[in-house]
Amino acid sequence: MSGQARADRAGLRSALWLPLFDDLADPIVAARLAGEAEGAGWHGVFVWDHVRWRAPVRQVADAWITLAAIAGATERVRLGPMVTPLARRRPVKVARETATLDRLSGGRLTLGVGLGSDRFGGELSKTGEEIDDRLRGQMLDESLEILTAAWSGQQVHHHGPHYTVDGIQFLPRPAQRPGVPVWTAGLAGHVKPLHRAARYQGFFPVNLSHADQLAEAVAAIAGLRPRPAPPYDIAVGLPPGTDPTPYAQAGATWWLPEFDPATVSLDQVRGVLRDGPATL
């Protein structure tokens, strides 16, 4: 039995995690893959959100248009960007996009968010975006405050250092109540990402090297959350073929196969898809 199947029997959910580059830089292709994944028993389909990537990647698809296509091609799987760098987005636009996509999908959206990085092709510096990590962290937190308020359906009055929303009501609301689940990405051993993660519905640790690292982060987040705590998700990205069972035992609730963006191909993704989670 594969490690993937063992983990699924332990209760770990599995989602395709598609870098929308080159072979996958086509919303029709991504939507077909999502439909195949749903038919094969996968629990989610998430996509990378970038405007460019370093060589040899040449083609990049828009994450949000692709997610709309995925929503139309599926009925059951969770879907969303994993992750979208909120600091390079306008929060009021994201408020409209998330509510619309959640309604389009019948309440299946999960919003993955993070700081973003300039290391993978200069997509921040080459487009005039903020490159200071500290400032992007502030913009991320402020954007999340605006989104949470917008999803409530009440008028939003926000006057912050980076954004202003002066008495706007964002209707219709998302299908999910009280709003779209948010998973925040960050380094597992850093204090600020863990505190941010504890305020929302899930954590997506990056650059994990072993399961013990994850266990420490899970314990830290648990200590920061209110009690009794509502359900919480921990998602891990691991290379295809890696046994995710130790990570499930450390607290992971979702496993995402992490494809190499420089070499990912449609055939490789379909191969992983066909090896999908075992039936419980």
What are the language-model segments listed below?
Residues 1-280:
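Active-site-adjacent structural elements that line small-molecule/cofactor binding pockets in enzymes
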